[in-house]
Regions:
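First transmembrane helix
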Residues: 34-63, 215-221
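Extracellular TM2-ECL1-early TM3 structural module of rhodopsin-like
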Residues: 34-42, 66-131, 138-141, 146-148
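Loop architecture of class A 7-transmembrane GPCRs
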Residues: 20-31, 97-118, 141, 147-154, ...
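Alpha-helical membrane-protein architecture signal
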Residues: 33-40, 68, 73, 77, ...
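Alpha-helical transmembrane segments of multi-pass membrane proteins
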Residues: 46-49, 78-90, 158-170, 206-214, ...
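Intracellular effector-coupling site of seven-transmembrane GPCRs
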Residues: 81, 187-195, 206-210, 225-262, ...
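Helix-to-loop junction signature of class
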Residues: 42, 46, 59, 85-101, ...
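Intrinsically disordered regulatory tails of 7TM GPCRs
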Residues: 1-29, 274-279, 313-362
Length: 362
């Protein structure tokens, strides 16, 4: 009886893994790259994200309590909260990939972990778009928007709308399973059986969550740069900070968000082709490229803290002072070779003088 039950369980397990195994057998890919690249990348991002967002939010709140909150500070604060919600889940993904893509934390935590990734992704895009519109209105239409851009009510209301809109976009994702039937794999998208219904949803959220905000952000910042270059009366510090912000946000979109959305859609389509029997080196390259872009997409949580430099003017001075303090402490604990040589030379001279005094005394 025990053998029969064991055989039944084994058959059930094999049948549950059949779709996954079939696609891997039809078009085998080297998953070793994923199992060392993503854990290493996620570990670095989690450490940088926790430190950067923690210090940045602390300084932003401390500064805002003294001088008062402004619209940009509210938007950046929401961006930091979205980053922290995501980076706290990265250690679980590190464990998942180091164990050979075996998820041991249960289906509920798998779904939450994947949800927080997409929540961070599209909340970051949403708030970066709001920041670009804020900069556009403040620089291109300064007189018309005087006072409106600095009050808190519009920025708070806008932040609430961004969160609500992101949750509405992600709501359909709850209907797609993230775990395989055996409860072993925790998919970042969904199981192979759901691809036909998942693809239209992903294409829709790519348009509403990324493409449209990307066009708005690019249009706003292109106009901002044109105005700043034409206007010679703009304060040089404001011009430099504004252009730095433009470059930073466009880098985030170009490096973190654009490649991910391109290769996520390509990877889903390649999985459909593989299920139909197709297999080529191009499909394998798409898979590897998609894994790289997943790491790049998470990198925005480590790069977003740079925006705190734009929202808090004294953060640079605080970080500089902190760096000098650390430098003095390190020099005290571990003096340089030149300092050690000088100290040894002084001691040698003092010893020689003492010896001469003793000789003279004798």
């Amino acid at each position: 009886m025990d053998l029969e039950e064991g055989a039944t369980v084994g058959l059930a397990l094999n049948s549950s893994l059949a779709p996954t195994r079939n696609i891997e057998i039809l078009c085998p890919v080297n998953t070793d790259f994923t199992q060392w690249f993503l854990p290493a990348f996620y570990l670095v991002v989690s450490l940088m994200g926790l430190l950067g967002n923690g210090v940045g939010l602390w300084n932003l709140c401390a500064t805002s309590r003294k001088s008062g909150w402004n619209a940009l500070g509210v938007l950046v604060c929401n961006l930091g909260v979205a980053d922290l919600l995501y980076v706290v889940t990265l250690p679980f993904l590190v464990s998942y990939y180091l164990q050979g893509r075996v998820w041991v934390f249960g289906p509920g935590w798998c779904r939450l972990t994947r949800l927080l990734f997409h929540l961070n992704l599209y909340a970051s895009i949403g708030f970066l778009t709001c920041i670009s519109v804020h900069r556009y209105l403040g620089i291109v239409h300064p007189l018309k928007m005087l006072g409106r851009c600095q009050t808190l009510s519009p920025s708070v209301s806008l932040s609430v709308l961004v969160w609500v809109w992101v949750l509405i976009q992600l709501a359909p994702d709850f209907s797609f399973s993230k775990m395989d039937r055996a409860g072993v794999r925790c998919h970042d998208t969904t199981h192979h059986e759901n691809l036909d219904t998942y693809m239209p949803y992903i294409l829709t959220i790519t348009m509403t969550g990324f493409a449209i905000p990307f066009l708005i952000t690019t249009g706003c910042y292109c106009h901002v740069v044109v105005v700043l270059r034409r206007n010679q009366n703009v304060d040089p510090i404001l011009k430099r900070r504004s252009i730095t912000l433009v470059v930073l946000v466009l880098v985030l979109f170009s490096v973190c968000f654009l490649p991910y959305h391109i290769f996520r859609n390509l990877n889903l389509q390649s999985r459909r082709w593989q299920l139909q029997g197709s297999c080529s080196q191009t499909l394998r390259n798409i898979y590897v490229s998609y894994q790289v872009t997943r790491g790049l997409a998470s990198l925005n949580s480590a790069l977003n803290p740079l925006l705190y430099l734009m929202a808090s003017e004294d953060l640079v001075m605080r970080l500089t002072a902190f760096g000098h303090t650390i430098g003095r402490a390190l020099r005290f604990l571990w003096p340089s070779q030149a300092q050690r040589h000088l100290s040894q030379k002084k001691l040698s001279i003092m010893d020689d003088e003492e010896c001469e005094e003793v000789s003279n005394g004798l």
